[in-house]
Amino acid sequence: MKKIMILLSAVLFCLAPAAAATADSLALKDITGGSYSPGYVYGVTPMADGESYSRLSDDRKRIVRHSFKTGKEIGTVFDVEKAKGVKLKGFDGYVLSPDENRILIQTQTKAIYRRSFTAVYYIYDVRTGKLEPLSDGGPQQVPLFSPDGNQVAFVRGGNLFLVKLLYGNAESQVTKDGKFNEIINGIPDWVNEEEFSTNRSFDFNADGTMLAWVRYDESQVPIYDMQEFKGLSPERMEYDEYPGSYRYKYPVAGARNATVSVLTFDIKNRVTRTMKVPMDSDSYVPRIKFTDNADKLAIVTLNRLQNQMDIYIGNPRSTECTLAVRETAKKYIGESAYGSLKFFGNNFAYLSDRDGFRHLYLYNLSGQLVKQVTRGSYDVTDFYGRDPKTGAFYYASRQESPLRKAVYCTDKNGREKKLSTETGTNSAIFSQGLRYFMNVYSSAALPPVTTLRSAADGKLLTTLVDNAALKQRIEPLLAQHEFFTFTTSEGVQLNGWMVKPRDFDPAKRYPVIMYQYSGPGSQEVTDSWNLGFFGGALYESYMAGKGYIYVIVDGRGTGGRGAEFEQCTYLQLGDKESKDQVETALYLGKLPYVDKERIAIWGWSFGGFNTLMSMSEGRPAFRAGVAVAAP
């Protein structure tokens, strides 16, 4: 990526006169190398006691427990140097059993796609201190404990396996038809993983007597050949002189997808059944999840056009399924609907934009709407959970502004309380039991600040990371930046962000670089430290130091402004998005300090696609453009 950024900068430098580097300027190698990266608290796992969280130590040798109230280290959950049996030098991650008496220790991790990976797992018994292999059959994927912690299911080679920890880690194979590029059990194929943001498609029921999973038959999906080079895969010495090829099933838009079905396995009787899910042959199953009732399996289906989502409640033994909720949309149903789905007792809740904005709805398992939890002309972005004792719901929303996000709770009577106190962008990780939360706050002017707070009233308990030193270091180096809005010739108001040189002179005319992503539901213009390509306005300030004005505008199709604004691009991607970027360039060209003859546009992925669409829109608004990794 560094080489690409240097090439991009070189291409765009033709638009502006050279500017001399100074001792107090940003260096591109420092930006791309992470020298200005803010500090975070990574890998937080809330613990069962509701009072603490665990995380992997920086040296990757321990699992450390911290207090949710003080943030202080209060114990060690696992230490490679003290474990009996297998000896490890370190590890990559871990999974706690629900009762926290056992831990899966993740080692030798190898990435597959964006979210999928294989790893060699070891099982650690907290009570005995013994560490031993989970399986001797090879690396595993997405291992999952049963609710009682006595079993582990995982995927290997497209098949599901089960390990019974009370029987000497006895391993059995649940499925046998898994085959690369043909049949996959329990984990999604590439397109389902990528588009539905998941890497696991199986679950245990509440009493650990049943397994359910999605089976993907991709035998009829077209094959795509992707070249592999030694430069990106140094271990592949055979590609030193000539590239190799990775062949996998990749359905382009409109092509045949994998055919999906939902199966169950009776662990005691070893009987496999196929659920009778009423769905079309080209439908998706983005989620399955057992409820708190061991005999009730929730199956979420989505039609090919993604404008109808059905939630079925099925019996894993009789295989009969009953429709609980049918969600329909004029355009499409976003990932937040099935991605936010949570079950608790005899109820479930999820996010829907059926009234024009994304809000939280509560149902019972029979499919009856209990109530609409939130309402208003704003989007709820995250659903954190419901307190079983008080009935309070915890969530984040853009109630204050499409550019900002805050954390809230609503009690059982509908009274809302704001828990985050800072204006900007807030994200939370709640303790089990929802007594505390870790809040990460940032703004366009402030690097992330991580704090611990009370979930009752948002009271600050302690600050874990404030990035004050980083702020002090880079504040003198950042260029002027400001938010703005303008209205297009079609009457659409768009939000934007502009970075000007530190020595900006309104009497001069400056060349402009426009960056955009523009993908459905995305947001680049937010009051957060994530602003810009590398965050913190760093790259944009660097380019401003070279004599450019840098502009980012979120056009139609982006998120945070309700369903109509976000979904108006349905089935016509690249049309309205490109028009809005051209409108941005035309608007900028009318500003007295902009040289309208020197406006460039660029973007990455969907942003690369929209760069090409914008430059070929018909109105000659751009002098240059760079499309990186355009689909």
What role is predicted for each listed range?
Residues 34, 71-72, 108-113, 117-120, ...:
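Predominantly five- to eight-bladed beta-propeller fold
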Residues 73-80, 132-135, 170-179, 273-276, ...:
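Beta-propeller fold detector
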Residues 55-82:
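Beta-propeller domains
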Residues 22-39, 267-276:
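A short helix->beta-strand "capping" segment at the edge of beta-propeller domains
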Residues 294, 426-631:
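Serine-hydrolase catalytic core recognition
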Residues 60-65, 113-120, 157-163, 220-226, ...:
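Structural motif
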Residues 37-56, 83-103, 121, 137-155, ...:
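Conserved beta-propeller blade repeats
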Residues 68-71, 125-129, 165-168, 266-270, ...:
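Short loop/turn segments that connect beta-strands within beta-propeller blades
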